[in-house]
Design a protein with these regions (language model features):
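Gly/Gly-Pro- and Ser/Thr-rich, intrinsically disordered tail segments characteristic of DNA damage-repair
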Residues: 1-117, 138, 239, 288, ...
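Basic, nucleic-acid-binding surfaces and adjacent catalytic neighborhoods in DNA/RNA-processing proteins
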Residues: 23-42, 55, 60, 147-303, ...
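Phosphate/anion-contacting hairpin/loop surfaces
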Residues: 71-182, 187-190, 194, 199
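Intrinsic disorder/low-complexity detector
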Residues: 76, 97, 176, 264, ...
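Generic alpha-helix initiation/capping and coil-helix boundary signal
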Residues: 166, 196, 310, 320-322, ...
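Compositionally biased, low-complexity segments
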Residues: 294, 311-315, 334
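Intrinsically disordered, low-complexity segments enriched in serine/threonine/proline/glycine
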Residues: 299, 308-318
Length: 341
């Protein structure tokens, strides 16, 4: 699912393409794409409205319309937005079309049909329950600490909770925890002030870098102006079996809170207080004792503990991951071609 950097990239690509245009009509090909409104009422609500701006809140795109109303677009798993000419080739996966007054149209393409589009008036606040924006100036270390210390959950599910902080998903939660050297099963209450500061810094640093690199084009994500490149700079996400960039030990993959989670069990130590309860014991049973707590230097075979040439098993894992990335890139290219984008 596209996260903050990917959605921000789509917003930045979309804004100059459609800002100032007027919506002439809307055609809905999959009624469930709409959130709480019928296709007829949606078309009536957007027809004749001028697009005043495009922004983002968390993982959702906000299209501001004249008259004070606005659209929200949640891409979910496979949602894509393209701006093409109205006489462009048809595509069976296009779920909704906004016809513009200049001969172009905005197409919402969504293979798995999970994406949602809503229409709201100025008085509505569909984002009331969403947490603060992690890249905003208001998201200070003090704010982060206060919110963190009010929670008792484990770090990985906590970072995915959109009421805690907006926009972080599976990719950047794994990356931030690895960069901060914090185990995904660690609980918020066990963090020291230095841990809190490190996690806050890494969340902001990694998200900012990902925005600059146009996000991670993994699976079906692509933006109107093309793919991102952050996927080539991820340290642990979808790299199970590959060597940890810090210590050379293989990256582990487990399921935490129903989500695939990638981490280094040697670099990201789990305190004894966090090894029992809350599902941790079940997950840890799949790991050896050194993997649970992280290996000590004395337990490493000679020559290990540093990054070096990958072993055969890791080479296989790396090759498999590369094939997966290439297949996803092929799907994204096919999507752009199918809509004439």
């Amino acid at each position: 699912m596209p996260e903050l950097p990917e959605v921000e990239t789509v917003v930045r690509d979309l804004r100059p393409l459609i800002a100032g245009a007027t919506i002439v009509d809307a055609t809905t090909h999959w009624a469930r794409t709409l959130r709480g409104i019928t296709p007829e009422l949606f078309a009536d609500g957007v027809a004749g409205r001028r697009i005043e701006g495009v922004s983002r809140r968390g993982k959702q795109i906000v299209v501001e319309l004249s008259g004070g109303s606005f659209l929200t677009i949640h891409l979910k798993m496979t949602g894509q937005l393209f701006v093409v000419r109205q006489d462009g080739p048809g595509d069976p996966y296009v779920r909704l079309v906004l016809e513009l007054d200049d001969g172009r149209e905005v197409r919402f393409r969504d293979i798995r049909k999970f994406g949602k589009i809503g229409l709201y008036v100025a008085a509505d606040d569909p984002f009331a329950a969403i947490g603060p924006e992690p890249l905003s100036d208001a998201f200070t270390l003090g704010v982060f600490r206060k919110r963190l210390r009010a929670r008792k959950g484990r770090l990985k599910p906590l970072l995915l909770d959109q009421t805690f902080v907006a926009g972080i998903g599976n990719i950047y939660a794994d990356e931030a925890l690895w960069a901060a050297r914090l185990h995904p099963l660690r609980t918020a209450r066990t963090l020291r002030p230095a841990d809190e500061r490190r996690l806050w810094l890494e969340i902001r640093r990694i998200l900012a870098e990902a925005v600059i690199r146009r996000g991670s084009s993994i699976d079906d994500y692509t933006a109107p102006d093309g793919d991102g490149e952050m996927q080539d700079h991820l340290q642990v996400y979808q790299r199970a079996g590959e060597p940890c960039p810090r210590c050379g030990r293989p990256i582990r993959r487990v399921v935490v809170g129903g989500r695939a989670t990638h981490f280094c069990s040697w670099c990201q130590r789990l305190p004894a207080a966090d090894r029992a309860g809350g599902g941790a014991a079940t997950i840890l049973r799949t790991m050896t004792t050194p993997e649970r707590r992280g290996r000590r230097w004395s337990e490493l075979p000679a020559g290990e503990g540093r990054v070096g040439p990958a072993e055969d098993g890791r080479s296989v894992a790396s090759s498999r991951a590369e094939r997966t990335r290439r297949a996803a890139a092929t799907r994204r290219a096919a999507a752009r071609a199918s809509v004439g984008g």
